[in-house]
């Protein structure tokens, strides 16, 4: 009975469905799904026939972005069960909701719930890039409907990562509120805010086909730390489109002339963009391999900084990787004295992040915040204080790096001109009381933000320690 119902779901979108519903859905069972599906896949999930019917009623006639994310039914049903238990929501509640909570992504998120779907897609894209594929025989996510918690305890890195993707999405949806006016949203609304663009099409595999747009010329002004608190309004108001999407991380970027919404941390197909030196009239066409900024930390630990990369591109029309091997501190921890003002910007950014970490923020664990350019002014959203502080650091650094001159002679991956010890940061926030970290003993601790008094110190640091180019006093050790 269960196997029949599961198999029949594949045919739902083809029977009187919406034109957006899974036109590329395979006619056969997805790869990796055993032909002998049986009840053992759903142990503890279905108690009886009524519970089976309840789950399928929860799925609705077409289950939106989940069809694009999941490649097998056991994992899908497990997610739906967790979504219903923890968030009290069903996929049917998201029928053509917003611009991303639908099967085919039509734009960037228009509200908080829509952003949850976007981040869920992106998380699976990045997992696929790491060759982490879904295994229907391994359901590692543990859902506790009594405590309304999701536990990821698998020792396998890929299983743990995929579980974390689902956990973050469900918890995000649980915190969000649905806007019924965004159900069955006309897709023209998602595309209406991207004038003067040229449409290209990319074929994708496991995730839906998307419509990338060639960027137009843009500029960006950095946002202060205090403005970061209002960023979420910009995310909801500037509803432009930039649909990323495939399990191969075939992704895109949109830069509109007036309003820009940019998904971060994803590869480009090599769209032509304008590269600007210090003279805006001198431009050359080039392709960016990605729109993230990579920073080589201690122990050869590569850190991905999507927000900084997106802001740099939006502000300068230069690919972020051009800044990664500049001077002594751009793109790595570095050593010696900064070579020029731009190099000092990179060191200042590193110091800013270190101060935020001392407040108890584990930056590597923070969810991604969309970057928005409205009237050439950058904003990045953020729910928690830690997210807002990270946005403030990145925005200040992007403005600083743009204001400084770019000296081609200082761009070298060898860093031969950087002898000595790493420059020390000004200890503007010392002493800082210990704040709860994500490694605390309870799930509640992991969601806590730094105390308000520490946030005040951090904001003062961002305002006070940055000079004319956003650079604070630096001294060697």
From Swiss-Prot:
Region (Phospholipase A2-like 3): 373-425
Subcellular location: Secreted
Sites where a glycan is attached: 38, 179, 407
Pfam families: Phospholip_A2_1
Extent of Acidic residues compositional bias: 442-452
Free-text note on domains in this protein's UniProt record: Consists of 3 PA2-type domains.
Domain of life: Eukaryota
Segments for region (Phospholipase A2-like 1): 76-190
Sequence similarity: Belongs to the phospholipase A2 family.
Location of the region described as Disordered in the Swiss-Prot/TrEMBL record: 428-477
Disulfides per UniProt: 85-145, 99-190, 101-117, 116-172, 123-165, 132-158, 152-163
Record PANTHER family: OTOCONIN-90, PHOSPHOLIPASE A2 FAMILY MEMBER
Encoding gene per record: OC90
InterPro entries, per database record: Otoconin-90 (IPR041798), PLipase_A2 (IPR001211), PLipase_A2_Asp_AS (IPR033112), PLipase_A2_dom (IPR016090), PLipase_A2_dom_sf (IPR036444), PLipase_A2_His_AS (IPR033113)
GO biological process: arachidonate secretion; lipid catabolic process; otolith mineralization; phosphatidylcholine metabolic process; phosphatidylglycerol metabolic process
Record's protein name: Otoconin-90
Keywords from the named record: Calcium, Disulfide bond, Glycoprotein, Metal-binding, Repeat, Secreted, Signal
Subunit and partners: Interacts with OTOL1.
Known function: Major protein of the otoconia, a calcium carbonate structure in the saccule and utricle of the ear. Together with OTOL1, acts as a scaffold for otoconia biomineralization: sequesters calcium and forms interconnecting fibrils between otoconia that are incorporated into the calcium crystal structure. Together with OTOL1, modulates calcite crystal morphology and growth kinetics. It is unlikely that this protein has phospholipase A2 activity.
Any one GO molecular function term: structural molecule activity
Region (Phospholipase A2-like 2): 305-361
GO cellular component assignments: extracellular matrix; extracellular region
Cleaved signal peptide residues: 1-17
Keyword field contains ATP-binding: no
């Amino acid at each position: 009975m269960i196997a029949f119902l599961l198999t029949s779901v594949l045919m739902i979108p083809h029977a009187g469905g919406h034109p957006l519903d899974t036109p590329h859905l395979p006619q056969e069972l997805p790869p990796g799904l055993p032909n002998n599906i049986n009840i053992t896949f759903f142990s503890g999930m279905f108690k009886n026939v009524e519970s089976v019917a309840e789950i399928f009623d929860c799925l609705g006639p077409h289950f939106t972005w989940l069809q694009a994310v999941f490649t097998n039914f056991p994992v899908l049903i497990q997610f739906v069960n967790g979504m219903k238990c923890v968030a009290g929501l069903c996929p049917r509640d998201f029928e053509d909701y917003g611009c991303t909570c639908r099967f085919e992504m039509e734009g960037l998120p228009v509200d908080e719930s829509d952003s949850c779907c976007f981040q869920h897609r992106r998380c699976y894209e990045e997992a696929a890039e790491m060759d982490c594929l879904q295994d229907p025989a391994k359901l590692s996510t543990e859902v506790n409907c009594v405590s309304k918690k999701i536990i990821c305890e698998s020792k396998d890195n890929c299983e743990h990562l995929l579980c974390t993707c689902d956990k973050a999405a469900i918890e995000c949806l649980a915190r969000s509120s649905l806007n019924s006016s965004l159900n069955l949203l006309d897709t023209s609304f998602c595309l209406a805010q991207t004038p003067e663009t040229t449409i290209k099409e990319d074929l994708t595999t496991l995730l839906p086909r998307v419509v990338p747009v060639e960027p137009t010329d843009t500029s960006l002004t950095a946002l202060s730390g205090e403005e970061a608190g209002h960023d979420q309004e910009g995310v909801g108001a500037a509803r432009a489109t930039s649909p990323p999407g495939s399990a191969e991380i075939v992704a895109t970027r949109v830069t509109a002339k007036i309003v820009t919404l940019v998904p971060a941390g994803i590869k480009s197909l090599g769209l032509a963009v304008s590269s600007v030196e210090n003279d805006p009239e001198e431009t050359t066409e080039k392709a960016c391999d990605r729109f993230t900024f990579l920073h080589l930390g201690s122990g050869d630990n590569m850190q991905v900084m999507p927000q900084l990369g997106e802001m740099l591109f939006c502000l300068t029309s230069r690919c972020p990787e051009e800044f990664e091997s500049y001077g002594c501190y751009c793109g790595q921890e570095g050593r010696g004295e900064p070579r020029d003002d731009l190099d000092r910007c990179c060191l200042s950014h590193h110091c800013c992040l270190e101060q935020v970490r001392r407040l108890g923020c584990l930056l590597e664990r923070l969810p991604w915040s969309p970057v928005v350019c409205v009237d050439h002014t950058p904003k990045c959203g953020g729910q928690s204080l830690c997210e807002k502080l990270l946005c403030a650091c990145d925005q200040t650094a992007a403005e600083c790096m743009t204001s400084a001159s770019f000296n081609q002679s200082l761009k070298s991956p060898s860093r031969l001109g950087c002898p000595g010890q790493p420059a020390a940061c000004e200890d503007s926030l010392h002493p800082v009381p210990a704040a709860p970290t994500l490694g605390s003993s309870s799930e509640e601790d992991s969601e806590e933000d730094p105390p308000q008094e520490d946030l005040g110190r951090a904001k003062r640091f961002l305002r006070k320690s940055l000079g004319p180019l956003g650079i604070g006093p630096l001294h060697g050790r």
